[in-house]
């Protein structure tokens, strides 16, 4: 007598082997048998005829650092088949954070992680794990190197002093000892966008030769994506450490169907050299992050208060307009996606709520402003805490990445406290199976399930 039998489904084991028709018996919360069990009985029987039975889905790239503290967390994730998630991505973990720059860090995190409760903003990851409520699925954390740098040195552009590096090293080592699964970088975000490659390698010195996974939101994902990937090869070579590129894409129509194949070929050559490089991708042509991400690096210096002051200055706005017009040296999302391709999904001020879900082009037309002025006014009024969805990627590039054997699927889900989230929060895995398996045929069912049930190989967890 079993507790549960899932009867008659097509059972995929997630290794790439073809499905087999079988029953799955469960006792005591563990799988007891996978075979035809026509005579077996159970307290509960699920009829899976005509359905797939798969391992639990794993998402190694979410931003649920603060969301795990919300009541009812986990239902949304379980209902889409997730049994394991990893947060702390893109350098933006909500711990460890010291008291020195705490308000600035939490303000910067809010559009992506949502409002961070005091019990989550711990000085150590051990404290974070101890405070975290029980969840109905497995949760893991990366330590965000951006948060670590901001804790040690704030959001300033200036060159770091030896004492800053020492503080960064201590925090990284402590977080890894506390149970971090690896280190995440956010080179497209402040303050890590201020690193040179040499400085970045110096900051990550404790990882040298340690086989500790490094995941990275690269410095650029548009016209400069190949150069950014070359930088990651250099980091992997210098540190002799595994590097995993997060949400690989080529933003902007001019970069589609050319840059991604170049990056994949670059990574393949690096692996032939003996380096450990991999990547992941989400299955949507639209991304989602903080609206501040449209700004060039120099406009992100000093933290949120400085950013807001800068955007309120007419001279600074004129300089910003020139920078966006030229697009040099940063991911110019205003040009890559277009003002009509940037939609605002999380706004806090009551007067701005009617604009939620609208494009910046549409809001500008309604307010009688040019899009950049409209954008700056909103960022000032909302104190920078706006989440956007931006349409900038290509489905053929996504398919090419999915076909690469060293890639896996992620959602890159953000969890703003209010607003309209990107559908990837709840639809990523269904979208992969329906769009790229059943409709387009880019992947077989067997290969698709490797992408979503075995991505932990890139983080060395099982």
Where do the model's predicted regions map?
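Divalent metal-binding pocket/active-site signature
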Residues: 174-234
